[in-house]
Regions:
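Solvent-exposed, extracytoplasmic
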Residues: 126-140, 213-267, 304-330, 436-452, ...
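Extracytoplasmic/periplasmic ligand-binding sensor regions of membrane-associated signaling proteins
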Residues: 130-131, 135-225, 270-281, 432, ...
Protein backbone atom coordinates (compact mmCIF):
# COMPACT_ATOMS: atom_id res chain seq x y z
CA UNK A 1 0.00 0.00 0.00
CA UNK A 2 1.10 3.59 -0.68
CA UNK A 3 -0.31 6.84 0.71
CA UNK A 4 -1.51 9.74 -1.40
CA UNK A 5 -2.84 12.81 0.44
CA UNK A 6 -3.60 10.81 3.56
CA UNK A 7 -5.41 7.94 1.83
CA UNK A 8 -3.87 4.47 1.45
CA UNK A 9 -4.07 3.06 -2.08
CA UNK A 10 -2.79 -0.25 -3.49
CA UNK A 11 0.67 0.08 -5.02
CA UNK A 12 -0.65 -0.36 -8.57
CA UNK A 13 -3.11 2.52 -8.11
CA UNK A 14 -1.16 5.03 -6.02
CA UNK A 15 0.99 6.48 -8.88
CA UNK A 16 -2.18 7.14 -10.88
CA UNK A 17 -4.56 8.41 -8.16
CA UNK A 18 -3.47 12.02 -8.70
CA UNK A 19 -4.69 11.78 -12.31
CA UNK A 20 -8.24 10.69 -11.38
CA UNK A 21 -10.51 13.76 -11.12
CA UNK A 22 -13.44 11.84 -9.63
CA UNK A 23 -11.29 10.34 -6.89
CA UNK A 24 -9.73 13.71 -6.07
CA UNK A 25 -13.11 15.46 -5.96
CA UNK A 26 -14.56 12.93 -3.53
CA UNK A 27 -11.35 12.89 -1.47
CA UNK A 28 -11.48 16.67 -0.99
CA UNK A 29 -15.18 16.63 -0.11
CA UNK A 30 -14.76 13.77 2.35
CA UNK A 31 -11.67 15.43 3.87
CA UNK A 32 -13.74 18.56 4.49
CA UNK A 33 -16.46 16.46 6.12
CA UNK A 34 -13.85 14.68 8.23
CA UNK A 35 -12.59 18.04 9.51
CA UNK A 36 -16.17 19.03 10.32
CA UNK A 37 -16.71 15.79 12.25
CA UNK A 38 -13.51 16.44 14.22
CA UNK A 39 -14.76 19.90 15.16
CA UNK A 40 -18.23 18.65 16.08
CA UNK A 41 -16.73 15.87 18.18
CA UNK A 42 -14.63 18.36 20.11
CA UNK A 43 -17.58 20.70 20.65
CA UNK A 44 -19.77 17.81 21.78
CA UNK A 45 -17.15 16.84 24.36
CA UNK A 46 -16.71 20.41 25.64
CA UNK A 47 -20.47 20.99 25.89
CA UNK A 48 -20.94 17.82 27.93
CA UNK A 49 -23.32 16.55 25.26
CA UNK A 50 -24.12 12.93 25.96
CA UNK A 51 -23.14 11.79 22.49
CA UNK A 52 -20.01 9.70 21.96
CA UNK A 53 -18.97 10.31 18.35
CA UNK A 54 -15.74 8.35 18.43
CA UNK A 55 -17.22 5.17 16.93
CA UNK A 56 -19.01 7.08 14.18
CA UNK A 57 -15.87 9.07 13.33
CA UNK A 58 -13.77 5.87 13.21
CA UNK A 59 -16.27 4.14 10.94
CA UNK A 60 -16.42 7.25 8.77
CA UNK A 61 -12.64 7.24 8.39
CA UNK A 62 -12.50 3.53 7.54
CA UNK A 63 -15.24 3.76 4.94
CA UNK A 64 -13.72 6.89 3.43
CA UNK A 65 -10.47 5.05 2.81
CA UNK A 66 -12.28 1.97 1.53
CA UNK A 67 -14.53 3.98 -0.78
CA UNK A 68 -11.74 6.06 -2.30
CA UNK A 69 -9.46 3.04 -2.77
CA UNK A 70 -12.30 1.11 -4.36
CA UNK A 71 -13.23 4.03 -6.61
CA UNK A 72 -9.60 4.42 -7.67
CA UNK A 73 -9.23 0.71 -8.41
CA UNK A 74 -12.42 0.60 -10.46
CA UNK A 75 -11.50 3.81 -12.29
CA UNK A 76 -8.18 2.22 -13.19
CA UNK A 77 -9.91 -1.00 -14.22
CA UNK A 78 -12.27 1.02 -16.41
CA UNK A 79 -9.28 2.60 -18.16
CA UNK A 80 -7.22 -0.58 -18.39
CA UNK A 81 -10.10 -2.80 -19.47
CA UNK A 82 -10.33 -1.47 -23.04
CA UNK A 83 -6.54 -1.18 -23.22
CA UNK A 84 -6.20 -4.80 -22.17
CA UNK A 85 -8.71 -5.89 -24.78
CA UNK A 86 -6.95 -3.84 -27.44
CA UNK A 87 -3.61 -5.42 -26.56
CA UNK A 88 -5.05 -8.94 -26.42
CA UNK A 89 -6.89 -8.58 -29.70
CA UNK A 90 -3.87 -7.01 -31.40
CA UNK A 91 -1.53 -9.87 -30.51
CA UNK A 92 -4.17 -12.54 -31.13
CA UNK A 93 -5.10 -11.16 -34.55
CA UNK A 94 -1.41 -11.11 -35.48
CA UNK A 95 -0.96 -14.65 -34.15
CA UNK A 96 -3.96 -15.91 -36.12
CA UNK A 97 -2.64 -14.16 -39.23
CA UNK A 98 0.76 -15.82 -38.82
CA UNK A 99 -0.88 -19.19 -38.23
CA UNK A 100 -2.44 -18.86 -41.68
CA UNK A 101 1.05 -18.22 -43.06
CA UNK A 102 2.27 -21.54 -41.67
CA UNK A 103 -0.44 -23.16 -43.79
CA UNK A 104 0.65 -21.16 -46.85
CA UNK A 105 4.28 -22.26 -46.55
CA UNK A 106 3.22 -25.89 -46.16
CA UNK A 107 1.09 -25.67 -49.29
CA UNK A 108 3.46 -23.66 -51.50
CA UNK A 109 6.56 -25.69 -50.65
CA UNK A 110 4.93 -28.66 -52.39
CA UNK A 111 3.64 -26.66 -55.37
CA UNK A 112 4.63 -28.50 -58.57
CA UNK A 113 5.82 -25.30 -60.26
CA UNK A 114 8.13 -24.50 -57.35
CA UNK A 115 9.51 -28.03 -57.07
CA UNK A 116 10.13 -28.18 -60.83
CA UNK A 117 11.92 -24.82 -60.87
CA UNK A 118 14.22 -25.96 -58.06
CA UNK A 119 15.16 -29.08 -60.03
CA UNK A 120 16.04 -27.72 -63.47
CA UNK A 121 16.61 -23.98 -62.74
CA UNK A 122 15.73 -23.12 -66.33
CA UNK A 123 15.64 -19.28 -66.69
CA UNK A 124 12.35 -19.37 -68.59
CA UNK A 125 10.81 -21.61 -65.96
CA UNK A 126 12.08 -19.39 -63.16
CA UNK A 127 10.63 -16.33 -64.92
CA UNK A 128 7.28 -18.09 -65.23
CA UNK A 129 7.48 -19.06 -61.57
CA UNK A 130 8.01 -15.43 -60.62
CA UNK A 131 4.73 -14.53 -62.31
CA UNK A 132 3.13 -17.49 -60.54
CA UNK A 133 4.31 -16.11 -57.21
CA UNK A 134 3.08 -12.64 -58.10
CA UNK A 135 -0.37 -14.06 -58.75
CA UNK A 136 -0.28 -15.74 -55.36
CA UNK A 137 0.90 -12.55 -53.61
CA UNK A 138 -1.83 -10.53 -55.33
CA UNK A 139 -4.43 -12.78 -53.69
CA UNK A 140 -2.70 -13.11 -50.33
CA UNK A 141 -1.65 -9.52 -49.77
CA UNK A 142 0.27 -10.15 -46.55
CA UNK A 143 3.71 -10.76 -48.09
CA UNK A 144 6.35 -8.23 -48.99
CA UNK A 145 8.52 -10.84 -50.67
CA UNK A 146 8.65 -14.52 -51.56
CA UNK A 147 12.12 -15.95 -52.13
CA UNK A 148 13.07 -19.33 -53.59
CA UNK A 149 16.62 -20.45 -52.85
CA UNK A 150 18.70 -23.47 -53.71
CA UNK A 151 20.08 -25.72 -50.97
CA UNK A 152 23.36 -23.83 -51.37
CA UNK A 153 21.67 -20.51 -50.55
CA UNK A 154 21.58 -19.16 -54.08
CA UNK A 155 18.53 -17.01 -54.82
CA UNK A 156 16.73 -18.69 -57.74
CA UNK A 157 13.84 -16.26 -58.05
CA UNK A 158 11.93 -13.83 -55.90
CA UNK A 159 8.83 -11.72 -55.90
CA UNK A 160 10.57 -8.33 -55.94
CA UNK A 161 13.93 -7.19 -57.25
CA UNK A 162 16.72 -7.32 -54.70
CA UNK A 163 19.53 -9.51 -53.45
CA UNK A 164 20.29 -12.12 -56.13
CA UNK A 165 23.46 -13.85 -54.94
CA UNK A 166 24.13 -16.57 -52.38
CA UNK A 167 22.52 -16.06 -49.00
CA UNK A 168 24.17 -17.02 -45.73
CA UNK A 169 21.02 -16.49 -43.68
CA UNK A 170 20.57 -18.94 -40.81
CA UNK A 171 16.99 -19.55 -41.90
CA UNK A 172 18.26 -21.64 -44.84
CA UNK A 173 20.10 -24.16 -42.69
CA UNK A 174 17.24 -24.35 -40.23
CA UNK A 175 14.73 -24.95 -43.01
CA UNK A 176 16.91 -27.61 -44.66
CA UNK A 177 17.16 -29.43 -41.35
CA UNK A 178 13.45 -29.14 -40.70
CA UNK A 179 12.51 -32.48 -42.28
CA UNK A 180 9.29 -31.22 -43.81
CA UNK A 181 8.46 -28.70 -41.09
CA UNK A 182 8.44 -24.94 -41.32
CA UNK A 183 10.66 -22.53 -39.39
CA UNK A 184 9.80 -19.02 -38.26
CA UNK A 185 12.41 -16.32 -37.70
CA UNK A 186 12.52 -12.61 -36.96
CA UNK A 187 16.05 -11.47 -37.62
CA UNK A 188 18.24 -9.46 -39.96
CA UNK A 189 18.35 -11.34 -43.26
CA UNK A 190 20.75 -10.71 -46.13
CA UNK A 191 18.23 -11.51 -48.85
CA UNK A 192 16.05 -8.76 -47.33
CA UNK A 193 18.82 -6.17 -47.42
CA UNK A 194 20.05 -7.09 -43.92
CA UNK A 195 16.85 -5.63 -42.49
CA UNK A 196 14.80 -7.35 -39.82
CA UNK A 197 12.32 -9.70 -41.46
CA UNK A 198 9.60 -11.99 -40.15
CA UNK A 199 10.06 -15.07 -42.31
CA UNK A 200 8.42 -18.47 -42.62
CA UNK A 201 10.59 -20.94 -44.48
CA UNK A 202 10.39 -24.58 -45.43
CA UNK A 203 12.54 -26.86 -47.49
CA UNK A 204 11.31 -27.89 -50.92
CA UNK A 205 11.57 -31.65 -51.38
CA UNK A 206 11.73 -34.01 -54.33
CA UNK A 207 11.64 -37.74 -53.67
CA UNK A 208 12.56 -37.14 -50.03
CA UNK A 209 15.60 -34.97 -50.77
CA UNK A 210 16.00 -31.23 -50.33
CA UNK A 211 15.69 -29.40 -53.65
CA UNK A 212 15.59 -25.87 -52.24
CA UNK A 213 14.17 -23.55 -49.61
CA UNK A 214 11.07 -21.40 -49.94
CA UNK A 215 10.87 -18.28 -47.74
CA UNK A 216 7.73 -16.20 -47.27
CA UNK A 217 8.59 -12.73 -45.95
CA UNK A 218 5.64 -11.37 -44.00
CA UNK A 219 4.76 -7.70 -44.48
CA UNK A 220 4.84 -7.01 -40.76
CA UNK A 221 4.83 -3.21 -41.05
CA UNK A 222 1.70 -3.17 -43.19
CA UNK A 223 -0.22 -5.76 -41.22
CA UNK A 224 0.73 -4.25 -37.86
CA UNK A 225 -0.30 -0.80 -39.09
CA UNK A 226 -3.71 -2.16 -40.10
CA UNK A 227 -4.14 -3.66 -36.64
CA UNK A 228 -3.02 -0.47 -34.89
CA UNK A 229 -5.28 1.75 -37.00
CA UNK A 230 -8.30 -0.40 -36.24
CA UNK A 231 -7.73 -0.64 -32.51
CA UNK A 232 -5.90 2.47 -31.26
CA UNK A 233 -7.91 5.54 -30.35
CA UNK A 234 -6.60 9.09 -30.43
CA UNK A 235 -3.31 9.55 -28.58
CA UNK A 236 -3.13 5.86 -27.62
CA UNK A 237 -0.04 3.79 -28.31
CA UNK A 238 -0.08 0.16 -29.40
CA UNK A 239 3.10 -1.86 -29.71
CA UNK A 240 4.38 -5.39 -30.11
CA UNK A 241 7.26 -6.38 -27.83
CA UNK A 242 9.46 -9.45 -28.06
CA UNK A 243 10.43 -11.95 -25.38
CA UNK A 244 13.24 -9.61 -24.23
CA UNK A 245 10.75 -6.75 -23.71
CA UNK A 246 12.08 -4.81 -26.69
CA UNK A 247 9.68 -2.95 -28.94
CA UNK A 248 9.26 -4.63 -32.33
CA UNK A 249 6.86 -2.10 -33.83
CA UNK A 250 4.50 0.57 -32.54
CA UNK A 251 2.11 3.11 -33.97
CA UNK A 252 4.15 5.94 -32.41
CA UNK A 253 7.89 5.66 -32.99
CA UNK A 254 8.47 8.91 -31.09
CA UNK A 255 7.16 7.47 -27.84
CA UNK A 256 7.97 3.79 -28.40
CA UNK A 257 10.67 3.41 -31.05
CA UNK A 258 11.66 -0.07 -32.30
CA UNK A 259 14.36 -1.57 -30.10
CA UNK A 260 13.42 0.32 -26.94
CA UNK A 261 13.51 -1.83 -23.83
CA UNK A 262 10.38 -1.80 -21.66
CA UNK A 263 11.63 -1.81 -18.07
CA UNK A 264 8.25 -1.90 -16.31
CA UNK A 265 7.01 -5.17 -14.83
CA UNK A 266 4.61 -7.12 -17.08
CA UNK A 267 1.75 -6.46 -14.64
CA UNK A 268 2.54 -2.73 -14.20
CA UNK A 269 -0.40 -0.35 -14.59
CA UNK A 270 1.68 2.79 -15.19
CA UNK A 271 4.57 3.65 -17.48
CA UNK A 272 6.27 7.01 -18.01
CA UNK A 273 7.08 7.98 -21.59
CA UNK A 274 8.58 11.35 -22.43
CA UNK A 275 7.85 12.64 -18.95
CA UNK A 276 4.16 11.73 -19.20
CA UNK A 277 2.50 9.04 -17.07
CA UNK A 278 0.61 6.50 -19.16
CA UNK A 279 -1.86 3.81 -18.17
CA UNK A 280 -0.59 0.56 -19.64
CA UNK A 281 -1.89 -2.95 -20.25
CA UNK A 282 0.19 -5.84 -21.55
CA UNK A 283 -1.10 -9.09 -22.99
CA UNK A 284 0.69 -12.21 -24.24
CA UNK A 285 -0.50 -14.15 -27.26
CA UNK A 286 -3.00 -16.92 -26.68
CA UNK A 287 -2.20 -20.15 -28.47
CA UNK A 288 -4.24 -20.88 -31.59
CA UNK A 289 -4.36 -24.62 -32.28
CA UNK A 290 -1.07 -24.94 -30.42
CA UNK A 291 0.61 -22.08 -32.30
CA UNK A 292 1.74 -19.11 -30.19
CA UNK A 293 3.52 -17.04 -32.82
CA UNK A 294 7.02 -15.62 -32.44
CA UNK A 295 6.66 -15.20 -28.68
CA UNK A 296 5.57 -11.58 -28.71
CA UNK A 297 3.20 -9.64 -26.50
CA UNK A 298 1.23 -6.46 -27.13
CA UNK A 299 1.23 -3.23 -25.13
CA UNK A 300 -1.57 -0.67 -25.12
CA UNK A 301 -0.98 2.71 -23.49
CA UNK A 302 -2.92 5.94 -22.99
CA UNK A 303 -1.85 9.16 -21.23
CA UNK A 304 -3.30 9.13 -17.73
CA UNK A 305 -4.97 12.51 -18.19
CA UNK A 306 -6.78 11.14 -21.24
CA UNK A 307 -7.52 7.72 -19.77
CA UNK A 308 -9.24 9.14 -16.70
CA UNK A 309 -10.71 12.23 -18.30
CA UNK A 310 -14.17 10.91 -19.14
CA UNK A 311 -15.10 8.65 -16.23
CA UNK A 312 -18.68 7.77 -15.50
CA UNK A 313 -19.61 11.43 -15.10
CA UNK A 314 -23.28 12.01 -14.40
CA UNK A 315 -24.36 8.50 -15.25
CA UNK A 316 -27.75 7.54 -13.88
CA UNK A 317 -28.30 5.35 -10.83
CA UNK A 318 -27.39 1.69 -11.02
CA UNK A 319 -29.68 -0.87 -9.44
CA UNK A 320 -28.10 -3.28 -6.98
CA UNK A 321 -28.97 -6.39 -8.96
CA UNK A 322 -26.91 -9.11 -10.49
CA UNK A 323 -24.42 -10.52 -8.01
CA UNK A 324 -22.32 -11.79 -10.89
CA UNK A 325 -21.85 -8.22 -12.17
CA UNK A 326 -20.73 -6.29 -9.08
CA UNK A 327 -18.31 -7.63 -6.51
CA UNK A 328 -19.30 -8.07 -2.88
CA UNK A 329 -16.84 -5.32 -1.99
CA UNK A 330 -18.69 -2.83 -4.19
CA UNK A 331 -22.10 -3.85 -2.89
CA UNK A 332 -20.91 -3.48 0.70
CA UNK A 333 -19.96 0.21 0.38
CA UNK A 334 -23.50 1.70 0.41
CA UNK A 335 -24.60 -0.87 3.00
CA UNK A 336 -21.86 0.28 5.36
CA UNK A 337 -22.67 3.92 4.64
CA UNK A 338 -26.31 3.38 5.62
CA UNK A 339 -25.22 1.62 8.82
CA UNK A 340 -23.09 4.65 9.78
CA UNK A 341 -26.09 6.90 9.15
CA UNK A 342 -28.34 4.73 11.35
CA UNK A 343 -25.84 4.91 14.21
CA UNK A 344 -25.61 8.66 13.77
CA UNK A 345 -29.41 9.02 13.78
CA UNK A 346 -29.61 7.05 17.03
CA UNK A 347 -26.89 9.18 18.57
CA UNK A 348 -28.67 12.42 17.63
CA UNK A 349 -32.02 11.08 18.84
CA UNK A 350 -30.55 10.06 22.19
CA UNK A 351 -28.90 13.45 22.49
CA UNK A 352 -32.20 15.20 21.87
CA UNK A 353 -33.91 13.09 24.54
CA UNK A 354 -31.17 13.96 27.01
CA UNK A 355 -31.49 17.68 26.21
CA UNK A 356 -35.29 17.72 26.34
CA UNK A 357 -35.28 18.74 30.01
CA UNK A 358 -32.56 21.34 29.48
CA UNK A 359 -32.76 24.74 27.87
CA UNK A 360 -29.23 24.85 26.36
CA UNK A 361 -29.62 26.54 22.99
CA UNK A 362 -26.00 25.71 22.13
CA UNK A 363 -26.52 21.99 22.65
CA UNK A 364 -29.66 22.02 20.54
CA UNK A 365 -27.86 23.89 17.77
CA UNK A 366 -24.95 21.49 17.99
CA UNK A 367 -27.27 18.51 17.60
CA UNK A 368 -28.89 20.13 14.58
CA UNK A 369 -25.47 20.70 13.04
CA UNK A 370 -24.50 17.07 13.72
CA UNK A 371 -27.71 15.92 12.02
CA UNK A 372 -27.12 18.22 9.02
CA UNK A 373 -23.52 17.06 8.69
CA UNK A 374 -24.74 13.49 8.83
CA UNK A 375 -27.10 14.18 5.96
CA UNK A 376 -24.28 15.76 3.93
CA UNK A 377 -22.08 12.77 4.71
CA UNK A 378 -24.80 10.34 3.65
CA UNK A 379 -25.33 12.30 0.44
CA UNK A 380 -21.60 12.30 -0.35
CA UNK A 381 -21.29 8.56 0.24
CA UNK A 382 -24.34 7.87 -1.90
CA UNK A 383 -22.99 10.02 -4.73
CA UNK A 384 -19.58 8.37 -4.53
CA UNK A 385 -21.14 4.90 -4.37
CA UNK A 386 -23.38 5.69 -7.33
CA UNK A 387 -20.42 6.92 -9.34
CA UNK A 388 -18.44 3.86 -8.33
CA UNK A 389 -21.12 1.51 -9.62
CA UNK A 390 -21.71 3.62 -12.72
CA UNK A 391 -17.97 3.39 -13.39
CA UNK A 392 -18.13 -0.40 -13.26
CA UNK A 393 -21.25 -0.48 -15.43
CA UNK A 394 -19.65 1.83 -17.99
CA UNK A 395 -16.63 -0.44 -18.13
CA UNK A 396 -18.78 -3.50 -18.73
CA UNK A 397 -20.73 -1.74 -21.47
CA UNK A 398 -17.57 -0.51 -23.18
CA UNK A 399 -16.07 -3.99 -22.96
CA UNK A 400 -19.15 -5.61 -24.51
CA UNK A 401 -19.29 -3.00 -27.28
CA UNK A 402 -15.60 -3.37 -28.14
CA UNK A 403 -15.72 -7.16 -28.17
CA UNK A 404 -18.83 -7.21 -30.35
CA UNK A 405 -17.29 -4.86 -32.91
CA UNK A 406 -14.03 -6.74 -33.05
CA UNK A 407 -15.71 -10.14 -33.25
CA UNK A 408 -17.32 -8.99 -36.48
CA UNK A 409 -13.95 -7.71 -37.75
CA UNK A 410 -12.19 -10.98 -36.95
CA UNK A 411 -14.89 -13.01 -38.68
CA UNK A 412 -14.74 -10.73 -41.72
CA UNK A 413 -10.96 -11.15 -41.92
CA UNK A 414 -11.32 -14.92 -41.65
CA UNK A 415 -13.85 -15.02 -44.49
CA UNK A 416 -11.62 -12.75 -46.57
CA UNK A 417 -8.82 -15.30 -46.20
CA UNK A 418 -11.22 -18.07 -47.24
CA UNK A 419 -12.11 -16.19 -50.43
CA UNK A 420 -8.38 -15.97 -51.20
CA UNK A 421 -7.99 -19.70 -50.59
CA UNK A 422 -10.69 -20.76 -53.01
CA UNK A 423 -9.52 -18.46 -55.79
CA UNK A 424 -5.98 -19.81 -55.54
CA UNK A 425 -6.87 -23.47 -55.16
CA UNK A 426 -9.23 -23.36 -58.13
CA UNK A 427 -6.17 -22.86 -60.34
CA UNK A 428 -4.24 -25.80 -58.85
CA UNK A 429 -3.06 -28.25 -61.50
CA UNK A 430 -3.67 -31.32 -59.32
CA UNK A 431 -7.31 -30.40 -58.81
CA UNK A 432 -7.72 -29.65 -62.51
CA UNK A 433 -6.92 -33.30 -63.37
CA UNK A 434 -10.37 -34.26 -62.00
CA UNK A 435 -8.86 -37.63 -61.10
CA UNK A 436 -10.72 -38.68 -57.97
CA UNK A 437 -7.70 -40.15 -56.19
CA UNK A 438 -5.42 -37.22 -56.99
CA UNK A 439 -8.08 -34.67 -56.09
CA UNK A 440 -8.96 -36.44 -52.83
CA UNK A 441 -5.31 -36.58 -51.73
CA UNK A 442 -4.82 -32.90 -52.60
CA UNK A 443 -7.94 -31.84 -50.71
CA UNK A 444 -6.93 -33.90 -47.67
CA UNK A 445 -3.50 -32.24 -47.65
CA UNK A 446 -5.06 -28.79 -47.94
CA UNK A 447 -7.54 -29.48 -45.15
CA UNK A 448 -4.69 -30.68 -42.96
CA UNK A 449 -2.95 -27.34 -43.45
CA UNK A 450 -5.98 -25.05 -43.43
CA UNK A 451 -7.82 -26.45 -40.44
CA UNK A 452 -10.62 -23.89 -40.46
CA UNK A 453 -12.57 -25.98 -42.99
CA UNK A 454 -15.00 -28.73 -42.01
CA UNK A 455 -14.80 -30.24 -45.51
CA UNK A 456 -13.44 -29.43 -48.97
CA UNK A 457 -15.24 -30.58 -52.12
CA UNK A 458 -14.56 -30.68 -55.85
CA UNK A 459 -17.57 -31.19 -58.12
CA UNK A 460 -17.92 -31.37 -61.91
CA UNK A 461 -19.97 -29.19 -64.24
CA UNK A 462 -23.08 -31.22 -63.42
CA UNK A 463 -22.67 -30.58 -59.70
CA UNK A 464 -21.60 -34.16 -58.94
CA UNK A 465 -19.05 -34.40 -56.11
CA UNK A 466 -15.84 -36.02 -57.37
CA UNK A 467 -13.89 -36.00 -54.10
CA UNK A 468 -14.01 -34.69 -50.54
CA UNK A 469 -11.29 -34.01 -48.00
CA UNK A 470 -13.05 -35.58 -45.01
CA UNK A 471 -16.60 -36.78 -45.62
CA UNK A 472 -16.29 -39.44 -48.32
CA UNK A 473 -20.00 -40.12 -47.99
CA UNK A 474 -20.83 -37.08 -50.14
CA UNK A 475 -18.75 -38.33 -53.08
CA UNK A 476 -20.96 -39.16 -56.05
CA UNK A 477 -23.79 -37.02 -54.74
CA UNK A 478 -25.20 -34.29 -57.01
CA UNK A 479 -25.42 -30.90 -55.32
CA UNK A 480 -28.60 -28.92 -55.91
CA UNK A 481 -27.74 -25.80 -53.91
CA UNK A 482 -28.26 -22.42 -55.66
CA UNK A 483 -24.59 -21.50 -55.23
CA UNK A 484 -23.53 -24.45 -57.41
CA UNK A 485 -24.97 -22.79 -60.51
CA UNK A 486 -23.39 -19.48 -59.48
CA UNK A 487 -19.95 -21.13 -59.26
CA UNK A 488 -20.33 -22.70 -62.70
CA UNK A 489 -21.72 -19.58 -64.39
Amino acid sequence: MATYKGISFPDTVAPLARHMPAVDDHREALAALSATWDTLGLLAHLSNLKADMREVRASFGELTGELLACLAEETLALARGPLGHQAQIAVDVLTRNLFERTADIGFLATDAAIVGACLDRDPARLAALREHLRTFAARYTVYRDIVLLGPDGRVLTRLVDGFAGWSSSSVIGRALGGQGGWVETYEATDFCGDALALTHARRVEHEGRAAGVLALVFDLEREATLIFERLAREDEVLAFVDADDRVVLSNDAARLPPGRRITARPDAAALRLGGVTHVVARRAAQAYQGYTGPGWAALALAPAELAFGDGAGDAGPVAFTGENVFSQRLRDVPVRAREIQRRLDRMVWNGRLHQASESSAFSRSLLEEIAATGRRTKDRFERASSQLLATVAAGLQAEARLLAELSVDILARCLYERANDIRWWAADAALATLDAGTVRATLARLNGLYTVYANLLVFDTQGRVLAASRDAGVEGRTLANPWVAECLA
